[in-house]
Amino acid sequence: MTEMSTETSPTNAAEPSRWRRKAILAASAAVAAVALVGCKADVISYELPAESARYTFQTETDGVTTAWEYTSDRPTEPDTPTSQPCIADVVLKETGPCRPEPLIFLRYDLGLGLDNTAEAGRLHPITVTGYYQDRLGTPPTVTELRAEASFDGGKVWRPVSTEAAGKNTFTARVKHPKRDRAPGGVALRITATDRAGNTVKQTIPEAYRLR
């Protein structure tokens, strides 16, 4: 059994009737605790094939789109800490080997001022860190990050230079135009890849504005 916990809701996925192995899509890791007190939890269960296959999982929340591509198969050994039980054990009352799906999540330090803006007409560094669900005992390492920026609402995307800045962490340097050349702010599109070949692409249509 595999488990997916995500901060957003799926917008398109394979038809459940074609899937045979249980995978849990939960609104958050807190769903297990919610189930324990008898509250209704936002949990969706799908059947996935037992054999290894490549999957795409897409979400959209408040205009931010995220697309994961990852490889999954039926686990033969559990890969979750004993202190954090599998959601399926609690919600679906199922037992057996369990592990989270190896989805890469992204954390941003945009280096903004107190007004959540950045200075126009200069090179601006941002920090992006890839991470995984806490339940994943042996996560891969994020090895590559590609960044793009748009100043016209996503019509034109410009490549942004990036460099490694620690484990799973990268610095991207965005060359800001003058403020009047980006009236709608700065959009970001980040693509990360880990050592196992899993990827995530996240598009933020208005990450921040210029001052």
Where are these regions (language model features)?
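Low-complexity, acidic Ser/Thr/Pro-rich "mucin-like" tracts of secreted and single-pass surface proteins
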Residues: 1-28, 32-211
